[in-house]
């Protein structure tokens, strides 16, 4: 059927119009992010009903989630109602309003369930089945695996013994059980699981497949070997330009000869590669060489870096791909074949027994849905059944949303109920393979890719492909920068998608022309001497600062009205790969009193209230578990004190269990009577609850515990009470859900909880935040898919990819099967096998590809502006990223495959065109102006040092109360209002005096003026600082733990306070003797010597400043002072708004009648890229100018003489003021 001509003035683009009306063949719509695919899908359904006269219940619409299905059905229903109102006489539309309720707009699982319910007789199952919960299903599967393994232990087949030797430890079969479970899930994602398992052994037995694996490895290794050879040649070219490096060139020439032999004839000579040593050690670069090439220092470093890169690449090939010769790899495969075959047999036994258990309990899981549906729709030979033919006749079109996330079983089901072949079929598929991020759910993006490559734009002879590329969500800056990144990051080799003109995003939203560049923020961590925060905590704090900046300066554009409004909390989302940073972010936002919500499925079992209830349940089930019993005793419910627990244990120190100690204490005549009564009540409770649990389900036991001890009421009254209450009710509801499963009893419930905790399947904190609540949200990229936000902060870019699965002894892959390491049972040594090496390499490639697609999803969530947050230890690492090698239009394949994290790639791509220091052969273009508008990046790259990020605004917000809250409470009470107004209007006559403390230190004054210069209210900062603890560090920590930076600073000042000044300077031996003397005199601790920076003190002793002081007429150390601030600040006479300044000057000396003061500084500082000593000196002077000015003015006030000063930095040197 031809596509109708598009009228003038319609809202649809040409591609959308084609997507709505294309028919007569299978259609694949590649719908980029924000391209309106859902609107197109709904419109296509409506036009099928309105234009083609098709009944809505004769369309099968498959969505990815139940929520999507409900929303789509609602949209279709609304459109039908609108059309019916416009044409009330239309009988067809009236019928659709009735049939919409039977319309098959659902997930594929829901369709399969309906199929099973209608045709259960074909399956010979009880029609009264129910669906098992995920937790129940896992428990039953675990139980089945345990039983099957026990059966095979009874048989003790030699292959089974070898398997257990390899995959089990001395302590448990946990790893073995995990591998069996993974194999089960992989197998059932195939149309014929048994057949898939049977084929696992084929590569281990057939040489033809082994040869294919050798070729696969050869092709992969060629990428790295070629890159290694390029790096080696660059190193040679650079060294060739230098003097006195003949030995270096000789080593490189030998390596070039070896590499030339490996690559001879354009093929990789594997035997030569494995039979020779590569990467000889390069001679050291001596001072003589540096002197001879003093004008080429950067080139010298680059040459060394290139040779290091060569060694790294060749080492990867030899360690990861060809650690042994190919013949040895093949020989191992033959010996592994019986083990692989037996492992497949175990999984088939598990599958059979698991299915039997499910039938006996009359339960089905989602895998059963798919396989039973397939059983109904196919004959024994795999051809469509009569039932399938009837569905083919019934459904006039099948529409599939999110097609990139389907698996092979689902594809087979769809193929059974669709009509025709690709060139004349009725299957309409919508998706975006660039957003395929569910491989862990066995989604198979290759299904989409294969069709995309096979279908054509005009649909001649095959299916039709339509590209929806126009984006109606984001500003052009987001789109063009995203295009630029992926143009250089994604292709068929890494990412599995060619990011060409058809794949890229095109601007289609009606925003105004204001500039909204993407912001790439690179946070350089402060070391421990500058911050007590970890790197992750620093990043969390920095993210909060970005949020505050957005709220203060950014606005949101309303496309309907063409006007702006201020940004609010709910306009901002923080996206991360996982929830690992959630706790740090929660704390950082809490510190700033910014409403924040983590849309997390993690952390539930760590909540205090949940841990209490679980401790209670575990103690009731088995009171001999000390951790849970004592935890319950120490809780708010029973409130035993630590000294009481100590009394109990001291009386019976050798008891195995604390419960025994309690019983023994109660029976001891010397026991404290009050404590005995308390213990008797506690044990009585335990016994009472134990008896109750025998006759009642778990949820009733929990309910009784809640009511007996007012648990709900107590936790509701705490901070976050609403969420705590929801968590407690959530656990209660989970217990009800558990009782509805096939398992019963307290023990089984605890096992159920343990299984969830072990597998990381958290319930998640109960969600008490709605979609319209005004909070900043954090969510994972996976959970953000399909959503959009005005401002997206994509953080955690520097967190490494999780490659833990690649280190397992068994690697699984849907396409290739199972790769098992070879384990020599006699020698008890493991080696990579041909299959494990090949499949591990494939798995790594697929993993990095999916991580790149996750980056695409994250970037395309932003509407107004995108913030990318990366974090590095130091700025030197950025130079290496700028110089990542390229190949054509992309970052080189080897660089992408070995990239540790997203930041590695994103920064490299975006920084290349902005860097003036890298050569043209490492840039994608000589001039960014040459790049087309649609992919020309608009990005601001900022390198921020954490010590420059103000932490002064982290305040204790509990000190502030809202007057509005008080007025709201007394609303309507005029007397109260008048009294409040009278008190608030009162003007204290000495208000200025309240704003300053009566006594201040110079350091405090320094912070005050620095804060005022930054525009912050110092009064709030000062109130926060008053709360700091001043307790000394405990002695046991001082002796055993590592000293903090401030403690080392104090120690260094103590040493300097007593340091002798001698004209002939003291020697290093004398310095050690002096330190030992301080220890003998107990001036410093005995273990302090290891923390004293001797080299820095010796540098001071050899400095000019030391010599000047040694020749001074008078020297005063640690001189305290107290002075009127009015005199120091030279305030007018009579000004009463003054304070007393107190302080301590490290050292004062008099030379030639002039007074000088010296202030020692142990600060560390970052020597940032390109900074000279002069610039560092200026920076350090500016940092302490206020403090030094006060010292100078104070001394001049006291002495009534001109005073000069020095700053001495142990890590920099002398600065004269």
Curated annotation (Swiss-Prot):
Binding annotation for ATP: 31-38
Q: Which PROSITE patterns match?
A: UVRD_HELICASE_ATP_BIND (PS51198), UVRD_HELICASE_CTER (PS51217)
UniProt cofactor(s): Mg(2+)
Keyword list (alphabetical) reads:
ATP-binding, DNA damage, DNA repair, DNA-binding, Exonuclease, Helicase, Hydrolase, Isomerase, Nuclease, Nucleotide-binding
Q: Which GO terms describe its biological process?
A: double-strand break repair via homologous recombination
**Enzyme Commission no:** 3.1.-.-, 5.6.2.4
SUPFAM superfamilies in the cross-refs: P-loop containing nucleoside triphosphate hydrolases, Restriction endonuclease-like
Q: Which family does it belong to?
A: Belongs to the helicase family. AddA subfamily.
Name this protein carries in UniProt: ATP-dependent helicase/nuclease subunit A
Q: Which organism is it from?
A: Staphylococcus aureus (strain MW2)
The top of its lineage is: Bacteria, Bacillati, Bacillota, Bacilli, Bacillales
Gene field: addA
């Amino acid at each position: 059927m031809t596509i109708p001509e598009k009228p003038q003035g319609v809202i649809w683009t040409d591609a959308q119009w084609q997507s709505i009306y294309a028919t007569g063949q299978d259609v694949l719509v590649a719908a980029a992010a924000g391209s309106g695919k859902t609107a197109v899908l709904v419109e296509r359904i409506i036009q099928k009903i309105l234009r083609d006269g098709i009944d809505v219940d004769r369309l099968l619409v498959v969505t990815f989630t139940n929520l999507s299905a409900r929303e789509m059905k609602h949209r279709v229903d609304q459109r039908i109602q609108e059309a019916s109102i416009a044409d009330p006489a239309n009988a067809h539309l009236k019928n659709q309003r009735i049939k919409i309720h039977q319309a098959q707009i659902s997930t594929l699982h829901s369709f399969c369930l309906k199929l099973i319910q209608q045709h259960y007789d074909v399956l010979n199952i009880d029609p009264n089945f129910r669906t098992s919960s995920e937790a129940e299903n896992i428990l039953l599967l675990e139980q089945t695996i345990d039983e099957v393994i026990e059966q095979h232990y009874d048989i003790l087949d030699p292959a089974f013994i070898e398997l257990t030797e390899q995959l089990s430890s001395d302590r448990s079969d946990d790893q073995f059980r995990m591998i069996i479970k993974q194999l089960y899930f992989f197998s059932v994602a195939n149309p014929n699981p048994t057949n898939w398992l049977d084929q696992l052994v084929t590569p281990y037995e057939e040489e033809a497949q082994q040869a294919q694996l050798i070729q696969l490895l050869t092709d992969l290794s060629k990428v790295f070997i070629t890159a290694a050879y390029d790096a080696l040649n660059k190193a040679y070219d650079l060294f060739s330009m230098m003097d006195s490096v003949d030995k270096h060139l000789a080593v490189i020439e030998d390596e070039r000869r070896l590499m030339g032999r490996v690559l001879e004839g354009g093929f990789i000579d594997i035997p030569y590669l494995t039979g020779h040593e590569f990467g000889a050690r390069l001679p050291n670069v001596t001072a003589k060489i540096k002197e001879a090439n003093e004008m080429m220092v950067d080139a010298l470093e680059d040459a060394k870096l290139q040779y290091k890169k060569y060694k790294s690449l060749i080492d990867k090939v030899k360690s990861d791909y060809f650690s042994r010769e190919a013949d040895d790899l093949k020989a191992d495969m033959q010996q592994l074949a019986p083990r692989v075959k037996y492992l497949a047999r175990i999984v088939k036994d598990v599958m059979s027994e698991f299915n039997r258990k499910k039938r006996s309990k009359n339960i089905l899981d989602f895998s059963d849905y798919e396989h039973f549906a397939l059983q109904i729709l196919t004959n024994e030979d795999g051809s469509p059944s009569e039932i399938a033919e009837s569905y083919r006749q019934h459904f006039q079109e099948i529409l599939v949303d999110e097609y990139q996330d389907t698996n092979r079983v689902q594809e087979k089901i769809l193929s059974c109920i669709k009509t025709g072949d690709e060139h004349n079929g009725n299957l309409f598929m919508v998706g975006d393979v660039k957003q395929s991020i569910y491989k862990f759910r066995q989604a198979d993006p290759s299904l989409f890719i294969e069709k995309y490559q096979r279908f054509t734009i005009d649909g001649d002879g095959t299916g039709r492909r339509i590209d929806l590329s126009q984006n109606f969500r984001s500003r052009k800056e987001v789109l063009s920068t995203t295009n630029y990144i992926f143009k250089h990051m994604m292709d068929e080799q890494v990412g599995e998608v060619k990011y060409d003109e058809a794949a890229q995003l095109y601007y289609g939203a009606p925003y105004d022309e204001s500039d909204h560049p993407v912001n790439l923020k690179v946070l350089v961590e402060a070391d421990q001497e500058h911050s007590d925060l970890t790197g992750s905590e620093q990043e969390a704090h920095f993210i909060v600062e970005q949020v505050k900046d957005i709220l203060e300066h950014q606005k949101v554009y309303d496309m309907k009205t063409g006007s702006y409004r201020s940004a609010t909390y709910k306009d901002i989302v923080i996206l991360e790969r996982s929830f690992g940073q959630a706790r740090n972010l929660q704390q950082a936002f809490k510190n700033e009193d910014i409403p924040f919500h983590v849309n997390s499925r993690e952390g539930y079992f760590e909540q205090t209230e949940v841990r209490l209830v679980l401790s209670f349940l575990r103690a009731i089930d088995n009171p001999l578990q000390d951790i849970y019993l004592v935890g319950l005793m120490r809780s708010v419910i029973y409130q035993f004190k630590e000294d009481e627990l100590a009394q109990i244990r001291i009386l019976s120190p050798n008891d195995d269990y604390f419960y025994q100690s309690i019983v023994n204490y109660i029976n001891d005549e010397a026991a404290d009577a009050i404590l005995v009564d308390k213990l008797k009540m506690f044990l009585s409770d335990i016994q009472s609850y134990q008896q109750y649990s025998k006759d009642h389900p778990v949820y009733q036991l929990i309910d009784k515990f809640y009511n007996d001890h007012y648990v709900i009421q107590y936790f509701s009254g705490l901070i976050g009470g609403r969420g705590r209450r929801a968590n407690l009710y959530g656990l209660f509801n989970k217990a009800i859900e558990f009782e509805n499963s096939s398992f019963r009893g307290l023990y089984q419930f605890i096992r159920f909880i343990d299984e969830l905790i072990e597998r990381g399947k958290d319930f998640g904190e109960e969600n008490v935040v709605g979609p319209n609540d005004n909070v900043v949200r954090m969510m994972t990229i996976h959970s953000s898919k399909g959503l959009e936000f005005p401002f997206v902060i994509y953080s955690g870019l520097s967190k490494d990819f999780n490659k833990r699965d690649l280190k397992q002894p068994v690697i699984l892959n849907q396409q290739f099967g199972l790769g098992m390491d070879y384990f020599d049972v006699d020698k008890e040594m493991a080696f990579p096998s041909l299959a494990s090496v090949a499949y591990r390499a494939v798995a790594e490639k697929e993993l990095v590809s999916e991580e790149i697609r996750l980056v695409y999803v994250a970037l395309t969530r932003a509407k107004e502006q995108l913030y990318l947050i990366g974090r590095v230890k130091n700025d030197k690492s950025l130079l290496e990223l700028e110089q990542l090698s390229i190949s054509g239009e992309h970052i080189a394949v080897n660089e992408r495959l070995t990239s540790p994290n997203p930041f590695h790639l994103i920064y490299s791509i975006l920084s290349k065109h902005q860097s003036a220091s890298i050569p043209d052969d490492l840039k994608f273009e000589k001039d960014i102006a040459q790049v087309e508008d649609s992919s020309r990046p608009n990005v601001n790259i900022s390198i921020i040092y954490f010590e420059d990020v103000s932490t002064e605004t982290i305040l204790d917000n509990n000190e502030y109360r809202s007057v509005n809250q008080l007025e709201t409470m007394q609303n309507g009470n005029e007397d109260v209002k008048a009294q409040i107004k009278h008190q608030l209007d009162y003007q204290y006559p000495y208000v200025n005096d309240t704003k300053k403390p009566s006594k201040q230190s110079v350091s405090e004054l320094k912070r005050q003026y620095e804060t005022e210069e930054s525009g912050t209210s110092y009064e709030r900062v000062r109130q926060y600082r008053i709360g700091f603890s001043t307790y000394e560090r405990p002695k046991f920590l001082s002796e055993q733990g590592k000293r903090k930076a401030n403690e080392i600073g104090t120690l260094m000042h103590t040493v300097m306070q007593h340091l002798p000044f001698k004209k002939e300077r003291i020697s290093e031996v004398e310095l050690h003797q002096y330190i030992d003397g301080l220890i003998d005199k107990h001036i410093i601790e005995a273990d302090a010597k290891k923390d004293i920076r001797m080299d820095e003190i010796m540098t001071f002793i050899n400095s000019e400043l030391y010599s000047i002081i040694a020749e001074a007429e008078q020297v005063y150390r640690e001189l305290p002072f107290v002075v009127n601030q009015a005199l120091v600040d030279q305030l007018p006479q009579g000004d009463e708004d003054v304070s007393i300044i107190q302080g301590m000057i490290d050292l004062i000396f008099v030379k030639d009648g002039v007074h000088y003061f010296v202030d020692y500084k142990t600060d560390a500082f970052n020597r940032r890229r390109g900074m000279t000593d002069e610039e560092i000196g200026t920076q350090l002077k500016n940092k302490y100018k206020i403090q030094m000015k006060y010292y100078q003015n104070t001394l001049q006030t006291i002495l009534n003489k001109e005073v000069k000063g020095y700053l001495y930095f142990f890590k920099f040197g002398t600065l004269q003021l």
